[in-house]
Amino acid sequence: MERIAVSPDGAGFVLVESRRPFHPWGMNYGNKGRLMEDFWDQDWQTFADDFRELKALGANVVRVHLQYGKFMSGPDKPNPQALTQLARLLRLAEATGIYLDITGLGSYRPADVPAWYDAMDEPARWAAQARFWEAVAEVCRSSTAVFCYDLLNEPISPGGKREAGQWRSGHLFGGYDFVHHIALDPAGRKREDIAVAWIRQLSGAIRKHDQEHLITVGLLPWSRQWKHLSGFLPSSVAPELDFLSVHIYPDAKKPDEAMECLRQFAAGKPVVIEETFPLSCGVVELETFMRASREIACGWIGHYDGDTLAELDALKEAKRLTAPQAVYREWLRLFVRLQPDFAR
């Protein structure tokens, strides 16, 4: 596998040695609603089988979500067992020919978040987050399977003071909280300045060990109602990142908003749609958006939850397909059909 870099024109990606263009085309990884750390110690075979299935579907990138509480035993104590499994994951990705979008600092399941982590003040928390990324980068630095490091999924730089310990959004989706605040009190600072300072500290931690692999952040979308709700303004954070990642789920009731959102992220760096799915629309609307998105985006990552297309087809034939499974089936069929055009 060749290392991936930003293309000379700054609009996309290339494979470093061959200089061939690279278009990320893949999935956010999950299995039956589980986080990978829930089962990868006891059932690695399922994990490995899923990667082979994703490769067969045409994916060249898989986004994996590392949970902070599983990777850190204390503020300055990485968990060696988790790092061993991460190294094993890198070998699996290399053997399978799949690149990894390594997203860190996950606190998705509130019950798994260490009490000491939530009790920290901002400087201590940022330092603990930097230590996490140092440990991860030290393991990953020599692997050609790393596409990028995503510092945190859907961070928010707060617009006002929050209660002590309220780092997460408090809004669960499927039992998980995917949105995290990087500070609890702006204390007179601009939201975008907090975001830039946080990115610099965590990127610096990675660069202590890995000067080559790309760095990004998985950003919440712009909307007509809320604008840039996250406080991570593309114009401010783009200079600090190798490329921009945005999460866009088209809404059938607002057919033009998805592209309007995407245009807000055209800030002089490559743009990857790091999450998308027919969550609030059908596959026809999603395909329309994805095809239009090529005006700006150069990579697309959807969702996978462990059911193969063959398994879903069999369930449909047996008339035992649930509504959520039907949505996944339609998405996987679209993913396979679009792959030749999008991952070229």
What are these regions (language model features)?
Residues 247, 301-304:
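His/Asp/Glu-enriched short active-site or ligand-binding loop at hydrolase and phosphoryl-transfer sites
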Residues 252-259:
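Substrate-binding surface in catalytic domains of secreted glycosidases
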